[in-house]
From Swiss-Prot:
Role, per record: Binds directly to 23S ribosomal RNA and is necessary for the in vitro assembly process of the 50S ribosomal subunit. It is not involved in the protein synthesizing functions of that subunit.
CDD domains documented for this protein: Ribosomal_L20
GO MF annotations in UniProt: rRNA binding; structural constituent of ribosome
Top-rank taxon, per record: Bacteria
The protein's name in its UniProt record: Large ribosomal subunit protein bL20
Similarity-based family: Belongs to the bacterial ribosomal protein bL20 family.
Length: 121
């Protein structure tokens, strides 16, 4: 019985890792032992940052909405509270987009929230 060798399997495994390490600096792009460490760390960073990206975008949307509503003498927290009282369900991503690209619609939202806040006060 012939001896089983892992030549093809190892070559494909090395090729896969070195393909992922393409563009790295120094020996990380062509030395397998270093490349595998760098690729694993890069994959850890990408996993972590896919979650961080969601937090950062939400913070950006909130900042944009806050800046836009302060032009109309209302704070972000009052604006969100007014939206909830008026039963308006628009997510922050859409509101930030309205504030930047479609100011007329956003002004209408602000007016509606001010009316709903005035009713409760």
């Amino acid at each position: 019985m012939s001896r089983a060798r892992s030549g093809k399997v190892n070559k494909n495994r090395h090729k896969k890792i070195l393909k992922l390490a393409k563009g790295y600096r120094g020996r990380a792009k062509n030395c397998f032992r270093i490349a595998i460490q760098k690729v694993e760390k890069a994959l850890q960073y990408s996993y972590r940052d896919r979650r961080n990206r969601k937090r950062q975008f939400r913070a950006l949307w909130i900042q944009r909405i806050n800046a836009a509503v302060r032009q109309y003498d209302i704070t972000y927290s009052q604006f969100i509270n007014g939206l909830k009282q008026a039963n308006i369900t628009v997510d922050r991503k859409v509101m930030a987009d309205l504030a930047v690209h479609n100011a007329d619609s956003f002004v209408h939202l602000v007016e509606l929230t001010k009316k709903s806040l005035a009713k409760t006060a």
